[in-house]
Amino acid sequence: MHFDDRFVLPKSLSGLRINGQRLLKRIATLGEIGPIQGKNGEPGSARLALTDEDREARELVTAWMRELGLAVRIDAIGNVLGVRAAADGSTANPVMTGSHIDTVRTGGLYDGNLGVLAGLEIIETLDTARITTRRPMAVAFFTNEEGARFNPDMMGSLVYCGGMSAEEAYNVVGIDGARVGDELARIGYLGTTPCPGEAPHAFVELHIEQGPVLEAEGIRFGAVTGVQGISWQELTISGESNHAGTTPMSLRHDAGYTAARIATFVRELALEMGQPHVGTVGQITLHPNLVNVVAATAVMTVDLRNTDEAILTESERRFSAFVAELAASEGVTIASRVLARFEPVAFDERVIGLVEHTIARLGNSGKRMPSGAGHDAQMLARMCPTAMIFTQSHKGISHNPAEFTEPADLVMGADLLLQVMLSLSETDIAISAEPPAVAILTTTHAHGSDVAVTHTAGIPDGGSSDGDDDDDVPDEQIAA
């Protein structure tokens, strides 16, 4: 474990703990906005980014920020930042925490919400104890982390750190035809604070794991070392519609069969490449989608992830080669476009070590682990030292009202975050050195007119697919 003992806090701060009941009450209250129920009656939320439900949640959380005396800023992409002043009015860069409050259509109560509301609870805990910190403390929630309505996901934090301009983001068109810029204005969150935003002294995000590893291994918390690289593609397969009964198998150009072959290859490739590589086909739409008609077109998404950039790139190469060969053998055309492409992100070893040390100091089991999901923290790592804390997720379930983390773990997670933020704020260690570069290779938008076809299999150079995928737009992009 890499731990600098200059992070050690005095006893007056090392014993400080949050008010658990207050945190849990805020989580439940926020969860009542956009309410849905799981199949067994579990409470969940549906708050797609920049919808009326998102606006209501923003108003609630922003009101809580103001009640706590935070200086609230809304930036050009609708990110909201609440800042607590330092002891001497210092204008030093703040120690920041935060996450997101938008959800997928089938959201639970904790994804994102925990990180934001734990930050507010930390502010209230400091206020109640009449403790002022050497550096400002900041709590943020970022716009459109999920990518469920607008692509790319993590849009707000991407714009905040300069990986995408606000003007480019404004022109993204969502699954319902709405523009990001128009919707920001409509809900009243087209802010004036410029982007890119201020670089924090450090950023730490508390989040549920959204996976089964911690629970399966009987470990309470994770010290997150980084985030897997992500490669998202959308494929449009154009074959030939024909009669299901009269067309011999040897004479078919079946888009549905081709999609099935691709889905099988994605799984086989992941198994062959081994852990931690994963591959997923999350969406398939067939046209005309009739029981007695060979499918003319298929639109599908492919999600490849790995913690090693070289391996991820190799998986993309092998996938592209397979798709080209398959298109030729089946007599179909396959057009692909990139939805998002992020390199793996390594978090700051000093902050990871601090998280590990704090987990152990407060009497908990912990482990170093990468994140399989994308998070706002990976964007903030572009501009400051960053790490994350993971709590257990029961059965690994997330993006589902059945998402559950033990209340005691939610509370302890917030205590860990409090102690880590205090250590970062109160020490003189020069932690704000330039972080390692984090390349965002490609981000294109799944539903806007600016999406470029990046590869076409089975079509001569200069050709184009005759598939009309406008009718096959997925209902909801997979959230990171």
Regions found by a protein language model. Name each.
Residues 62-66, 71, 75, 79-181, ...:
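Active-site metal-coordination/substrate-binding segment of hydrolases
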